Amino acid sequence: MTIPRNLSILAEYAGTVNAPVLNLTNAGEVTTVSATAATGTINYDVITQSVLYYTTNASGNWTLNIRGNSSTSLNTFMATNQTVTIAFLVTQGSPAFYQSALTIDGNSITPKWQGGTAPTSGNASAIDIYTITVVKTGSATYTAFASQTQFK
C-alpha cells in the first residue's frame, strides 16, 4: 500500500471514544526555511507549516501574527477546544532582537510566558526558538502559552 506524502484525514465520531484516535511512532512536520530577517509583522500560516525558520539575522523586534493563511483565519481553521503548537526559529546576530507582540488573525493577545515574564531581549549570535501553543476556547477567543529558548 502506498500512502500519499500529504495525507489528511478527518474523522468524526458520535458517542464516546475510549481509545486513542491516533498513535504515531514518528511524524514529520512541515518546515519552511527562509533566508529572511525577522522584523516588523511576520505572518505565521499554520496551514502551511508547523515550523518557520528564518536564517538571516533579525534586524528589528517583531510581531508574530498567527493565522490559518492569507485567505483563512485561524478562527475559521480551528474548532473550539482545539490546540495548535508552532515553532518560530529566529537567527540572531549582534545586536539581537525579540518578539515584542503576538497577534492572532491581527488581534492582539497576551500570551502566558514560561517563567511568568515575556522576553525583553534576544540572544546575540544564537538561534532563538519561540514555541507557542494556542488553545481555542471559544469563537475568536484563545489562550496562548509561549516560551523563548536560546540555542548556540
Language model segments and positions:
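Short carbohydrate-recognition loop motifs
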Residues: 48-54
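Intrinsic low-complexity, repeat-rich intrinsically disordered segments enriched
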Residues: 1-47
